């Protein structure tokens, strides 16, 4: 009898020990898992950062994605020319009688181009891109707010892209614009950790979903396009609902940044202002109070180019009062960073980085700096890196 009890006790103890070991292994695995969220308004560069992580830490792009990119990139170009031709027709740029046919086709009936046979589609893209009116457009209005950012990369590469044997390069895929719908996650090993990086759609209609991913977030990477200072938000008044729902949770009223932009038409919101407001409402969110906040002030290359043609204080008059208001990229970036910091409670730390998400090495380096903070290495409270 005694022996039986002894055996049962030993078996129970063994079982307990096995369960303990299992729990310890699971806890350790969970500790290795780091959840990171990419947030920001649409077109800021979130998905581009995910692409760079895939290039750096996973297998990059597969064959299907590369083939699919041929069509997405050509549609990106058709959409860009649609806007460009529209602006041309409403400007003082001379359009010859011969040019008018295709310029009007792109401006008003671009859907028809997407339905053409590939050879015809390439013919019209090649023809229109060589027009004098298009060249003039790029000389005078390249940084018009209606011109998508990717065209600054695709236009000089059109000879290659609009040819029948085109195979997109990794760089082409990084510059390609594809709106994110829904929520996407990638997972990769980084030092001793497993990073779960979550990418969301930035459109107003998509933002309602964000709050469902706020639990257990180690770091928020908030991405803002520095080049968005002369752009407006997508106009979807209905979708403003999300902001009230997000703020209801934390019981706070959304505060607008002090130096906000001058807006030409009533009802329009400056995209940089929108980004700052969105950042502040997220930074204050109680679910994220334990998270590290990394601000990616992105598209620094486009900011530099844009400032050669556009005067920042025309959009943000408060910049005239800034210490160095020389319209240089450095001073404008500092002003923008300050817009994000203004009004933040001092204990709410934030690490800001100037980035160019289209450059693989730049994102690799910035991500390493962010991880130094997250994993607790020594780190000075940063200003722009
Ligand atoms: N020139 C330039 N283009 C960028 C940069 N970051 C992103 N883009 C481009 O901006 C567009 C929108 O980027 P995407 O990552 O889709 O934005 P999301 O809506 O925030 O996910 C794409 O065409 C990108 O290639 C950058 O630093 N410089
Ligand atoms: Mg995206």
Swiss-Prot record:
Domain of life: Eukaryota
Binding site for Mg(2+): 47, 180
Region (G5 motif): 355-360
Keyword Nucleotide-binding among UniProt keywords: yes
Region (G2 motif): 172-180
Keywords: GTP-binding, Lipoprotein, Magnesium, Metal-binding, Myristate, Nucleotide-binding, Palmitate, Transducer
GO CC annotations on file: axon; cytoplasm; heterotrimeric G-protein complex; neuronal cell body; synapse
GO biological process, one term: adenylate cyclase-modulating G protein-coupled receptor signaling pathway
Ranges for domain G-alpha: 32-385
InterPro entries: Gprotein_alpha_su (IPR001019), GproteinA_insert (IPR011025), P-loop_NTPase (IPR027417)
Region named G4 motif: 294-301
PROSITE patterns to which the protein is assigned, alphabetical: G_ALPHA (PS51882)
Region (G3 motif): 195-204
Subunit structure: G proteins are composed of 3 units; alpha, beta and gamma. The alpha chain contains the guanine nucleotide binding site.
Protein family membership: Belongs to the G-alpha family.
Chain's role: Guanine nucleotide-binding proteins (G proteins) are involved as modulators or transducers in various transmembrane signaling systems.
This protein's name: Guanine nucleotide-binding protein alpha-5 subunit
The organism of origin for this protein: Caenorhabditis elegans
Highest classification ranks of the organism: Eukaryota, Metazoa, Ecdysozoa, Nematoda, Chromadorea
Recorded name of the encoding gene: gpa-5
């Amino acid at each position: 009898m005694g022996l039986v009890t002894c055996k049962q006790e030993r078996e129970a103890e063994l079982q307990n020990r096995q369960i303990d070991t299992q729990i310890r292994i699971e806890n350790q695995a969970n500790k290795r898992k780091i959840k990171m969220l990419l947030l920001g308004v649409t077109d800021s560069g979130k998905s581009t950062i995910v692409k760079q992580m895939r290039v750096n830490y996973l297998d990059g792009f597969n064959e299907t994605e590369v083939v699919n990119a041929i069509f997405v990139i050509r549609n990106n170009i058709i959409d860009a020319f649609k806007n460009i031709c529209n602006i041309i027709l409403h400007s003082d740029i001379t359009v010859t009688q011969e040019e008018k046919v295709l310029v009007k086709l792109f401006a008003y009936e671009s859907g028809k181009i997407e339905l053409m046979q590939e050879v015809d589609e390439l013919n019209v893209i090649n023809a229109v891109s060589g027009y004098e009116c298009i060249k003039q457009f790029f000389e005078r209005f390249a940084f018009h707010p209606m011109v998508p950012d990717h065209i600054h990369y695709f236009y000089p590469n059109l000879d290659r892209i609009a040819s029948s044997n085109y195979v997109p390069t990794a760089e082409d895929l990084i510059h390609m614009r594809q709106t994110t719908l829904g929520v996407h996650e990638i997972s990769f090993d980084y030092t001793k950790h497993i990073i779960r990086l979550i990418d969301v759609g930035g459109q107003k209609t998509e933002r309602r979903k964000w709050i469902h991913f706020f639990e257990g977030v180690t770091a928020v990477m908030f991405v803002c396009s520095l080049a968005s200072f002369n752009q407006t938000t997508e106009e979807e008044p209905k979708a403003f609902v999300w902001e009230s729902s997000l703020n209801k949770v934390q019981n706070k009223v959304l505060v607008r940044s002090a130096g906000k932009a001058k807006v030409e038409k009533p009802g329009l919101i400056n995209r940089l202002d929108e980004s700052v407001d969105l950042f502040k409402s997220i930074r204050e969110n109680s679910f994220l109070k334990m998270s590290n906040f990394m601000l990616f002030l992105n598209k620094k290359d486009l900011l530099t180019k844009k400032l050669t043609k556009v005067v920042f204080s025309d959009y943000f008059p408060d910049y005239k009062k800034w210490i160095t208001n020389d319209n240089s990229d450095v001073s404008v970036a500092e002003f923008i960073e300050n817009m994000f910091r203004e009004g933040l409670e001092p204990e709410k730390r934030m690490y800001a980085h100037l980035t160019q998400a289209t450059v693989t090495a730049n994102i690799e380096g910035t991500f390493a700096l962010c991880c130094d903070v997250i994993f607790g290495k020594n780190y000075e409270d940063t200003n722009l890196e």
